[in-house]
Amino acid sequence: MYLSRNPSGAALAAILVALILSCNFPSSTAGIEYSDVLPDSFPSAPAESLPHFLLEPEDAYIVKNKPVELVCKANPATQIYFKCNGEWVNQNDHITKERVDDVTGLVVREVQIEVSRQQVEELFGLEDYWCQCVAWSSAGTTKSKRSYVRIAYLRKNFDQEPLGKEVALEQEALLQCRPPEGVPPAEVEWLKNEEIIDPTKDTNFLITIDHNLIIKQARLSDTANYTCVSKNIVAKRRSTTATVIVFVNGGWSSWTEWSPCNNRCGHGWQKRTRTCTNPAPLNGGTMCEGQQYQKFACNTMCPVDGGWTEWSKWSACSTECTHWRSRECNAPTPKNGGKDCSGMLLDSKNCTDGLCMQNKRVLGETKSRLLESTGDVALYAGLVVAIFIVIILLMAVGIVVYRRNCREFDTDITDSSAALTGGFHPVNFKTSRHDNSQLIHPAMQPDLTANAGIYRGNMYALQDSADKIPMTNSPLLDPLPNLKIKVYNSSTVGSSPGIHDGNNLLGTKPTGTYPSDNNIMNARNKNMSMQHLLTLPRDSSNSVTGTFGSLGGRLTFPNTGVSLLIPQGAIPQGKYYEMYLMINKRENTVLPSEGTQTILSPIITCGPTGLLLCKPVILTVPHCADINTSDWILQLKTQSHQGNWEEVVTLNEETLNTPCYCQLESHSCHTLLDQLGTYAFVGESYSRSAIKRLQLAIFAPMLCTSLEYNLKVYCVEDTPDALKEVLELEKTLGGYLVEEPKLLMFKDSYHNLRLSIHDIPHSLWRSKLMAKYQEIPFYHIWSGSQRTLHCTFTLERYSLAATELTCKICVRQVEGEGQIFQLHTLLEENVKSFDPFCSQAENSVTTHLGPYAFKIPFSIRQKICNSLDAPNSRGNDWRLLAQKLCMDRYLNYFATKASPTGVILDLWEALHQDDGDLNTLASALEEMGKSEMMLVMATDGDC
């Protein structure tokens, strides 16, 4: 090994460098440069191979003014030179070493140069300072990779420093930190009271990819001083300290028992107290609001002592020479604990002034016999009372046993009847209402059918109203004699036929509560729902299936708006899952709504449950909420294996523990899920101004050979699956859709939906509706428990020759919006039905596999993720992309993912499955200043 800085070698090298720098000549082959100007005196051997680099120069940073050393090593190599920024480095700046490899016997040449801060600063242009080695052998030249030399620095000021805050106990706290700009990029760590926070040891802390600190659930022990520390090879910077105070708001203890009335007689007060100690306010928490004590007026009846009346007159003188007088203790009678009268009730004295002929002995015997007879009477009276009490007890026990036997007997009869009839119990019991001036005879009831021909549950008359619409149960019942207007209902199920609670009748529900149609239905369907969850039958009419692997894909339910997007990498490599989507029939499912909630979407099961997913999948379901109004409390619910519904997330109330993310659009909800299962979207109104969208669809019979002609007006939720269900039902019943359905905005105002028919040509037709209008009760619509609600208008033509009908049907919510249908129907055999899904017939493919399911090519997607996943001090990273794509409602969900950009792009795929317009994504990237990504999309997208 020796150094090549010797005078003879320097002269030869200088000549070589001068020739190279002064000549502009093309290389003969790729990868061989300047080989034709090398001196002939260089040794070469035809058998030699191209130089191979054993050590290539690495990226380096200049700290302060200390130069960096770049080293490369190659064999076989006759010469090695450095080239920096396209210019050859002077040979005098090279330090060359060489040795013979003990194994191969080849000469290993090593070259080293130094790069100073001045050289790097003198470079002009956008490109960083770079160097690479060029090695020569007799076979040609080889270039090493480029190594970049940068001046290391770390600015003093943070782009954003954490700010102190006060946070309530068990609430989430976010401390933001953007480290100062530096080269190389600074590493960030957080200090809590000068101790390093390690999220792996304390899982209550989370440091996001953009260096923010999240306290998931603030504890009292988290009250501390927090500091953001940024460091690289140059320096270490500390932010200002942010003080986090975890406060506890005061809470009231339970009320004490009411104290005794403070006045033993007359008007007084009772008092009870509570204390603000459950918990006590801490660290500046608010005091309890409300009264610390309550008073209650009490009135204690004063005790009244008894008083004697006047003595009665003396009785006649008896044979014992004694007469009597008496008095009573009722002047006043003792009350409220007052004392009884003291003294004798009876008074007696001798009435002969001592002239009585009986001696004292006879008189004493008489008194003794009188006392004995009195004792016998008391004994006999006690025995009679005891016998009477025993008889009463025996009678009571007998009555209880008798009633219990009767109840069991009735239950057996009911169960047997249900077994024989399949659970279908027609009930004709109705209660007349004489307090309503608008009532007419029950036989004049319009047709209001829900799930006609599908549901086989118990049926009950809800109201005997003429101008309002009572609800019965199933169109499979034969109509009563002379009953021309029929009424049906699918979800009014009672526990015992013929027995009704007055509060459940139409129009008698108290303000502020809804009749619990779905609660009545849930009692019947809970066991059925449990079996449904376990077996999950695959009915082709309401389910679709597909098999997917690690490349992902999309499963679509045609004409329903329901789909499941499985991103690439969601299924483990080498695994294949058969996945399915199923729309659950509401009559067979426990309903998710409770109280004043309303169902806003179909109940969807995606499965199978329990799958191991590496990434979230996106479930898309339609909904019928008008989200332009801000009065909604919207929730996503899931059904447990026990059949109960549980809240998954309330929109705009997400925390780090929320397992999913919902992207709400005007007609659909796209949900990122880590677990498959049964889901539904429900809503509730804040202040009775929320609005849900309904579809109004009118059907007529395809063929009419009688004088009667029925027009059915369906009122269903504005979701594709609801209309699809009605179309399939009417197809089986021989009906057709007269014209395109219309939209109705239905407000949570307790007002019913009113339907009426007008402008009938009375010379040819007459209406058999005796009332002016029909009504569908508000809560039947709002609860969402009844899927195919409708009213029927029965018309009669005077002659079979009348084959044309024109009329108007008006549908509106009382004190709300409405729609008017101008109908013109022909009673012909070849009548054509309006098909709302005709434009979607082409898209009947249910499964798209691998790359065919995604709009963004995988190569473009990877480059976008690599560019945006890492946090940027200028903010043009994945957070800005989410903002540009309107997906920034809760960024912390994406921050917890390994690739936030990838999850955002998956959600974009779900939102744009119909249009797939990459221009929207390109526009967002352009606005972010990511023009290089647009170039990638233009080049790779054309391939």
Swiss-Prot record:
Residue span(s) of domain TSP type-1: 249-303, 305-357
Domain Death, residue spans: 863-941
Q: Listed GO cellular component terms?
A: plasma membrane
Q: Does the keyword Transmembrane helix apply?
A: yes
Q: Where do the TM regions start and end?
A: 381-401
Q: Name one Pfam family in it.
A: UPA
What ranges does the Extracellular topological domain annotation cover? 31-380
Q: Name one GO biological process term.
A: anterior/posterior axon guidance
Q: What domain of life does the native source organism fall in?
A: Eukaryota
Q: Which cysteines are joined by disulfide bonds?
A: 72-133, 84-131, 177-228, 261-298, 265-302, 276-288, 317-351, 321-356, 329-341
Molecular functions (GO terms): netrin receptor activity
The entry's comment on post-translational modification says: Phosphorylated on cytoplasmic tyrosine residues.
| InterPro entries in the cross-refs | DEATH-like_dom_sf (IPR011029), Death_dom (IPR000488), Death_UNC5B (IPR042156), Ig-like_dom (IPR007110), Ig-like_dom_sf (IPR036179), Ig-like_fold (IPR013783), Ig_I-set (IPR013098), Ig_sub (IPR003599)
Expressed, tissue-wise, as follows:
In the developing visual system, it is expressed within the developing optic vesicles and later become restricted to the dorsal ciliary marginal zone, a site of retinoblast proliferation and differentiation.
List the ranges whose topology is Cytoplasmic: 402-943
Residue span of the signal peptide, if any?
1-30
> How does this chain sit within the bilayer?
Single-pass type I membrane protein
Q: Which residues are glycosylated?
A: 225, 350
Give all residue intervals belonging to the ZU5 domain: 542-685
Location(s) in or outside the cell: Cell membrane
SMART domains in the record, alphabetically?
Answer: DEATH, IG, IGc2, TSP1, ZU5
> What is this protein's function?
Plays a role in cell-cell adhesion during embryonic development. Receptor for netrin required for axon guidance. Mediates axon repulsion of neuronal growth cones in the developing nervous system upon ligand binding.
- Describe, as the record does, how this protein assembles with itself and its partners: Interacts (via extracellular domain) with flrt3 (via extracellular domain). Interacts with rnd1.
Q: What family name appears in the similarity comment?
A: Belongs to the unc-5 family.
* Name listed for the protein in its UniProt record: Netrin receptor UNC5B-a
Which organism does this record belong to? Answer: Xenopus laevis
